Regions:
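Structural signature of eukaryotic scaffold interfaces centered on beta-propeller domains
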Residues: 37-48, 95-102, 110-111, 153-185, ...
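Bacterial Sec-dependent N-terminal signal peptides
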Residues: 1-28
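Short beta-strand elements that form the blades of beta-propeller/WD-repeat-like
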Residues: 47-63, 96, 102-116, 184-197, ...
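Beta-propeller blade signature
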Residues: 67-75, 120-132, 201-212, 254-266, ...
């Protein structure tokens, strides 16, 4: 699991639609008396739905605090716990996630207007013990001078910047440390000296639960502008830490898979990564899209780690995708590529760089890593914003590959043109049947052929045993009412309908036909 994986899962997409079918409901405004601030789904470490959390605000309660309340619902929408708490005044709202300790973490969204700019500090996360329904500020640590320092008060941003500038003047660099609590027990700490244009004196350390050092792994000790090493962790388990090591020698780069023993800190395996551009290997562990979305691009199985990235032929253009598999027994690495031009039998006008007709290009929306070894790639036809034109999206395109990453088919889901809200139509996905199959959801605003009226439609697309089935829920207009879809328990979707003016904010589970 990546260290930032859970946070990368915090905020779900939403869209504006209206709905006319009645179902089992829960009134969010009746669950607490405060102002409703946020609602989101909660997932466990296996990405299974745990339930939902709804957050409410009561305004300023002190010079540096605000009063909030949380309500936890199970996946059947039954309220199971609630409590009022004091949060930092610079928190505007909280979203929730379940960490590997099975604690519910409330992660804040900063409010930069709550205090004067020179007094602003980043709000702290809150930690809820689900077994006792108790809440406290989440404990964070800094590491400096060979010891852990508990962060009890958030540091003023302006003062922190002054300290950094003073340290840079004195030493010529800033000392940086990052502390992560890990599921395998204890802590992982990164430390290094940051000179601005380069770093050196890198150290990766592991500590036990009592903060005793178990091992230290030093690298890039003498790094400078011309020669340096950089290591990115992309996975870890009870046995190993998996990293991509990049070495720079003047203007030349080389890349390696470097596996470090979790228990001893020694290098277990090093495998050169070759045959691809520097840009491809640099970005193999993460994927960003032109419409400003990051995607989860890997999945860990019992015997392997699979990831798919863009295959770059220059700094700014890619000609398709590259799949990398790490064998967890031998640590051997294998690559396979899929090029945009391989899609020509299905998309005749596609270019080598993924462009289509009228300036549209294929923009990534999701990856699906199935148990049989195949990978599905979901994309949307996207046109970037011009000087005098809005960004636009149209059809969704699903690319099938087999276990060897060979193209096995393409399916196009025709969709009306959307302007501006280019991240709003594709919603989310869920694995089905223990990862063998998948379902994904998108919306579309369509005109009725007879009445000529435009209505929102929700499309539920299941891929089971390699075959697609689509269910469509037609939406009726209801002025000024919004509906936000969320992940529901398997076989259901949760719809939240609200209108702030009418003080209407309800959720309901809708049964799906799969």
């Amino acid at each position: 699991m990546k260290f930032d994986y859970l946070q990368a899962k915090l905020f779900l997409l939403f869209f504006l639609i209206s709905f006319s079918v009645f179902a089992q409901t829960q009134d969010l405004l009746a669950l607490a008396s405060g102002e409703h601030l946020y609602f989101n789904a909660l997932f466990d470490q296996d990405e299974n739905l745990y339930g939902y959390v709804s957050v409410y605000g009561y305004g300023k309660s002190g010079d540096k605090t605000r009063k909030f309340e949380y309500v936890i619902l199970d996946k059947n929408l039954n309220p199971v716990a609630h409590k009022e708490f004091e949060g930092d005044i610079t928190a505007s709202l909280y979203a929730g996630y379940i960490d590997f300790n099975k604690k519910l973490i409330l992660f804040p969204k900063p409010d930069h207007t709550a205090v004067r700019s020179k007094e602003f500090f980043y709000p702290r996360s809150m930690e809820i013990d689900l077994s006792t329904n108790t809440i406290k500020p989440k404990t964070y640590y800094e590491y400096e001078n060979n010891s852990f320092i508990e962060v009890t008060e958030p540091k003023n941003v302006r003062d922190a910047r002054k300290e950094n500038k003073a340290e840079k003047r004195e030493k010529g660099y800033n000392y940086v440390s990052e502390v992560y609590e890990i599921e395998e027990g204890g802590y992982i700490v990164f430390e290094y000296n940051d000179y601005g244009k380069y770093t050196n004196n890198q150290n990766l350390m592991r500590f036990d639960e009592d903060k005793n050092m178990l091992w230290s792994f030093k690298y890039n000790e003498d790094g400078d502008k011309k020669n340096s090493e950089f290591m990115r962790v992309f996975e870890h388990d009870k046995n190993y830490i998996y990293t991509i090591l990049r070495k720079k020698n003047n203007k030349d780069f080389s890349f390696y898979l470097q596996v470090i023993d979790m228990n001893t800190g020694t290098v277990t395996a090093t495998r050169p990564l070759t045959g691809f551009s520097d840009e491809t290997l640099e970005a193999i562990t993460f994927v960003y899209t032109d419409s400003y979305r990051s995607l989860d691009n890997d999945k860990t199985f019992d015997d392997k780690i699979v990831m798919v990235g863009k295959n770059y032929n220059s700094m700014f253009t890619s000609d398709g995708f590259v799949r990398m598999i790490v064998d967890k027994k031998t640590f051997d690495v294998s690559f396979r590529t899929l090029h945009y031009q391989d899609l020509k039998p299905y998309l005749p006008k596609i270019t080598a760089n993924g462009y289509l007709e009228k300036g549209y290009k294929l923009e990534l929306r999701d990856f699906f890593f199935l148990e049989d070894g195949s990978v599905g790639i979901l994309m949307e036809k996207y046109k970037a914003q011009g000087s005098y034109s809005a960004p636009k999206t149209t059809d969704l395109v699903y690319v099938f590959t087999d276990k060897d990453f060979n193209l096995s088919g393409v399916k196009v889901f025709e969709k009306e043109k959307t302007k501006w809200a280019v991240n709003a139509d594709y919603l989310f996905s869920q694995y089905l049947n223990d990862g063998k199959d998948v379902v994904f959801f998108y919306r579309d605003l369509q005109k009725d052929d007879e009445t000529k009226e435009k209505n929102w439609n929700l499309f539920i697309n299941t891929l089971i045993d390699g075959k697609f089935n689509q269910e469509q829920i037609q939406i009726s207009e209801k002025d000024n009412y919004l509906i936000i879809p969320y992940v529901g328990k398997e076989g259901y979707i949760l719809l939240r309908e609200f209108n702030k003016k009418d003080k209407y904010n309800k959720i309901r589970l809708e049964r799906l036909n799969y």
